[in-house]
Amino acid sequence: MKQRTLSIIKPDALKKKVVGKIIDRFESNGLEVIAMKRLHLSVKDAENFYAIHRERPFFKDLIEFMVSGPVVVMVLEGKDAVAKNRDLMGATDPKLAQKGTIRADFAESIDANAVHGSDSLENAHNEIAFFFATREF
């Protein structure tokens, strides 16, 4: 089934200048980038986007990291886009990620793990709406 999902290329990946390589992974695996923008999240935006993690011990560090530099947010579209994107990203901890996944190849740590991807269709819908107006894709 054709789906849409959100992907965020995080500040660590932008600093390493691997944005193009990450986008190529998506495109060469059947995911089309239908909307994309580069931006610098404010603390408020990062806190609102990651509100589900507010009570978790890593929340403060996550927010500090996500506002430490620019990010690239994208809407990806394709067959089973949510699952395909998650497979391409690999495990949250790059040490546990399978060889050839984005996180295994480009991430430094569980905190600086290169990419974010929606974990369900419902969350994809909400996350896309957080960053993009319908007219943008």
Swiss-Prot record:
<protein>
    <recommendedName>
        <fullName>Nucleoside diphosphate kinase</fullName>
        <ecNumber>2.7.4.6</ecNumber>
    </recommendedName>
</protein>
<feature type="active site" description="Pros-phosphohistidine intermediate">
    <location>
        <position position="116"/>
    </location>
</feature>
<keyword id="KW-0479">Metal-binding</keyword>
<keyword id="KW-0067">ATP-binding</keyword>
<dbReference type="GO" id="GO:0006228">
    <property type="term" value="P:UTP biosynthetic process"/>
</dbReference>
<dbReference type="GO" id="GO:0046872">
    <property type="term" value="F:metal ion binding"/>
</dbReference>
<keyword id="KW-0808">Transferase</keyword>
<dbReference type="InterPro" id="IPR036850">
    <property type="entry name" value="NDK-like_dom_sf"/>
</dbReference>
<dbReference type="InterPro" id="IPR001564">
    <property type="entry name" value="Nucleoside_diP_kinase"/>
</dbReference>
<comment type="subunit">
    <text>Homotetramer.</text>
</comment>
<feature type="binding site">
    <location>
        <position position="92"/>
    </location>
    <ligand>
        <name>ATP</name>
    </ligand>
</feature>
<dbReference type="InterPro" id="IPR034907">
    <property type="entry name" value="NDK-like_dom"/>
</dbReference>
<dbReference type="Pfam" id="PF00334">
    <property type="entry name" value="NDK"/>
</dbReference>
<dbReference type="GO" id="GO:0005524">
    <property type="term" value="F:ATP binding"/>
</dbReference>
<keyword id="KW-0597">Phosphoprotein</keyword>
<feature type="binding site">
    <location>
        <position position="58"/>
    </location>
    <ligand>
        <name>ATP</name>
    </ligand>
</feature>
<keyword id="KW-0547">Nucleotide-binding</keyword>
<feature type="binding site">
    <location>
        <position position="113"/>
    </location>
    <ligand>
        <name>ATP</name>
    </ligand>
</feature>
<keyword id="KW-0546">Nucleotide metabolism</keyword>
<keyword id="KW-0418">Kinase</keyword>
<feature type="binding site">
    <location>
        <position position="86"/>
    </location>
    <ligand>
        <name>ATP</name>
    </ligand>
</feature>
<dbReference type="InterPro" id="IPR023005">
    <property type="entry name" value="Nucleoside_diP_kinase_AS"/>
</dbReference>
<feature type="binding site">
    <location>
        <position position="10"/>
    </location>
    <ligand>
        <name>ATP</name>
    </ligand>
</feature>
<comment type="similarity">
    <text>Belongs to the NDK family.</text>
</comment>
<comment type="function">
    <text>Major role in the synthesis of nucleoside triphosphates other than ATP. The ATP gamma phosphate is transferred to the NDP beta phosphate via a ping-pong mechanism, using a phosphorylated active-site intermediate.</text>
</comment>
<dbReference type="GO" id="GO:0004550">
    <property type="term" value="F:nucleoside diphosphate kinase activity"/>
</dbReference>
<keyword id="KW-0460">Magnesium</keyword>
<dbReference type="GO" id="GO:0006241">
    <property type="term" value="P:CTP biosynthetic process"/>
</dbReference>
<dbReference type="GO" id="GO:0005737">
    <property type="term" value="C:cytoplasm"/>
</dbReference>
<keyword id="KW-0963">Cytoplasm</keyword>
<dbReference type="GO" id="GO:0006183">
    <property type="term" value="P:GTP biosynthetic process"/>
</dbReference>
<feature type="binding site">
    <location>
        <position position="103"/>
    </location>
    <ligand>
        <name>ATP</name>
    </ligand>
</feature>
